[in-house]
A protein has these predicted regions:
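Acidic, polar low-complexity linker/tail segments
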Residues: 1-32, 41-44
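Short, solvent-exposed polar/charged micro-motifs at secondary-structure junctions
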Residues: 15-18, 75-78, 126, 146
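Von Willebrand factor
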Residues: 25-83, 88-91, 100-119, 123, ...
Length: 158
């Protein structure tokens, strides 16, 4: 992502005959966000996930497709910046299976810029590796390391 553009020059210096690039807002076309709503993910973790999603929308002009799942896809919500503050409606509470999210993305033809997965990793049923970059944002210390994607440990109790 580039913070500057020549298509809209910086007007501050134009009267001096100096042409500098203007700032442009960072834009990501679409982000898919999988939220693990299984029984092992508590309200504190879901609250932290919501805060992180709000921060993403505040920083980037994007569309978030939020996929709530436990052992299956339970619900999907779509958000944009104008939807802040976010009101997530997580549904779930059963066991955990990551594979249905991958199938849902394929079945619905979503090709997001990246996939962000909020989870406690208390599951070993991983989907096929997606075509887009994947970041596992993990609450707590549980679970095995995913076979692909980047891993980010979120601070518990934050």
């Amino acid at each position: 992502l580039n913070d500057y553009t020549w298509s809209a020059p910086n007007r501050r210096y134009l009267h001096h005959g100096i042409y500098l690039p203007g700032r442009q807002e960072q834009r990501i076309p679409q982000l898919a966000v999988a939220v693990d709503c299984s029984g092992s993910v508590d309200d504190a973790a879901l609250s932290l996930f919501c805060e992180e999603l709000s921060s993403i929308l505040a920083a980037y002009e994007t569309e978030l497709v939020v996929i709530f799942h436990d052992s299956r896809v339970q619900a999907v919500q779509t958000f944009r910046r104008q939807d802040l503050p976010l009101h997530l409606r997580p549904v779930g509470g059963g066991g955990t299976d990551f594979k249905p999210v991958g199938r849902w993305l394929d079945d619905n033809g979503l090709r997001p810029a990246c996939l962000l997965w909020f989870t406690d990793l208390e599951c070993s049923s991983f989907p096929d590796e997606p075509a887009c970059p994947l970041l596992w944002a993990v609450w707590g210390q549980g679970g095995e390391r995913p076979p692909f994607g980047e891993l980010l440990r979120l601070p518990a109790g934050a």
